[in-house]
Amino acid sequence: MRNAVILAAVLMMATGANGQTPQTPAPAAAAPAVELKVGDQAPDFTLHGTDGKMHKLSDYKGKKAVVVAWFPKAYTSGCTIECKSLAENGDKIKQYNVAYFMASVDNAEDNKGFAEKEKADFPLLSDPTKATATAYGVLNPNGLAKRWTFYIGKDGKILGIDKEVKPKTSAEDMVTKLGEYGVEKTK
């Protein structure tokens, strides 16, 4: 009998006096990113650039196309190769009416040092909160950005998404795609 009373007391403490299981609120799950597609409105962002400016996507709307080349991590081999490709061939990209950036979830200080080391003549954007990377669906399970490039038209809509970026030829590939997507050339 004594064991039955102890068991009943333990059960009451575990389930509460009313016999209901206590409910602890489940932690809020991060909203899963909807996969962006060609024709979708590109999510707006405001990110710090290595040029010391804040870059807001909507500021370019109606003025020029935008290319955002996401990369995993500053100072790593593939990212270094991609940055060098874009820096060494910037004159070809600048033949188009386009603002182009590399972007990562690295902090601004790391990206600034990386850009200076690789002599990048274009801004690298920092998204340390990972909010923009999440909105673009590029955040991988390790918390780094996937190497994807987004081509965004003057109207703010996505013209193309390159999910097979080749770091060594990224600049040449970017120029080819800008032509394919009908981005106007500068005069």
Where are these regions (language model features)?
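Short loop/turn microsegments at loop-to-beta-strand junctions
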Residues: 42-43, 65, 146-148
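Structural microenvironment flanking redox-active thiols in thiol-disulfide oxidoreductases
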Residues: 75, 80-118, 129-134
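Positively charged n-region of N-terminal signal peptides that target proteins for export
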Residues: 1-4, 20
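Thiol-/selenol-based redox modules, centered on thioredoxin-like
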Residues: 145-187
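A short beta-strand-turn-helix
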Residues: 36, 45-65
